[in-house]
Amino acid sequence: MKKLLLIAILLVSTTIQAQKSKVLEGDWKNLKGISAYNLEFEYENLEIPKYDSEEDFLKDKMAKREEKEPGAGERFKKAWFADREEHYEPKFAESFNKRWDDKEVVVGRDMASADYTMKIQTTFLYPGYNVGVMRQNSKVDAIISVYKNDAPDTILFSVKYTKAEGNAAFGNDYDSGVRVGEAYAKMAKTFAKELSKKAK
């Protein structure tokens, strides 16, 4: 048990260190005083390793599954898109919000009370894999941009995160949605920490 715990800690430490951020526009200080954000997620022109497009990725994965079991390909496609609302997006919001003990800053979908929007544009996604004896973390790159709802063309702040890696504790992430969801959680954690320190 101690060895498993040590491995889990090392995996988390490596994941946090591997993640990088680069400010693309504006300054962290532009976000000072903002207490609520409406979340918006975008997955257009998503890059997936070894494929020209997300469409090519889906065609390949669906065909391979369909050969083994009729109907499995369509189920894979349905799950692939469903994972966004079931895993990626709620994990991002949950991870971000729990970094603020007094709820000084909150994010969420369809927050009518929020005057600002936080847009998470995913640019790269590697789902990773877990086949028991072998596994690889998921990896996500995304651009987080903030703008006022009544001025969406005026970006107050934009930052790009690369190499946000996802894995569940003790390797319990055989489902790709769980692995990728953890990458979004780690990205949100890093963003919240930077926001807390730099938006002053």
Residue ranges of model-derived segments:
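Bacterial Sec-dependent N-terminal signal peptides
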Residues: M1-L24
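Outer-envelope beta-barrel architecture signal
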Residues: L4, G33-Y37, A114-Y116, D153-I155
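A structural "domain/chain start" motif
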Residues: A18-E86, P90, K193-K200
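Surface-exposed short loop/turn segments
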Residues: S21-K22, K103-T154, G166-Y174
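Generic short beta-strand segments
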Residues: F41-L46, Q121-P127, Y161-T162
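Short secondary-structure boundary motifs at beta->alpha junctions and helix caps
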Residues: E69-F81, A151-K197
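Surface-exposed helix-capping loop/turn segments at secondary-structure junctions
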Residues: K98-G108, L195-K200
